[in-house]
Amino acid sequence: NSDMGAVEGVRKITGREVPFVQVDCCDYEAFRKVFEEYEFDSVIHFAASKAVGESVQKPLEYYRNNLTSFMNVIRLMREFGRHNIVFSSSCTVYGEADKLPVTEQTPRKPATSPYGNTKQMCEDILRDSLAAYDGLRGIALRYFNPIGAHPSALIGELPRGVPQNLVPYITQTAAGVRECLSVFGDDYPGFLIAILPPG
């Protein structure tokens, strides 16, 4: 999460000053300075644009950001001898699966959005890089809208803008940011959960 409030929340929770560098991962030279300045063993790569709908409206921005930043990570890891990467992929790599629920053995289908395409391409780049470069180790995690918050509520799911999926609407309503949560449709299995703001 690139929100400075999240960085401050981590500092409060840990009671430590946490190094934070704001850099465009697509800017190779600027990103390179991070690798020069800091010692670390592993990279967890979350830096990506992630709104499926927006990716349909702005496909070139998504391809540029998500692919360039990931390739820069791999290039810099090789240059500086960093060997371990965890890649934040997405369940969108499954496309329109033939069978639900999907498992890790479910074959990938064509993605249904530019965002999904970028995640498939990054997985391919990771696979090919692991095969080509000795010592490089990595894994891709295929998330399904991860949610949650620290018990202190200093960090977690409470977006400030317009949410892109249901859970942020629920948390905003529970936190009193939204007055109510409207649920539309009539094909729910016999129950409806009302979410009311505190008080």
Question: Can you say where each PLM-predicted feature lies in the sequence?
Answer:
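N-terminal Rossmann-like NAD(P)+-binding domain of SDR-like oxidoreductases, especially those catalyzing
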Residues: 1-149
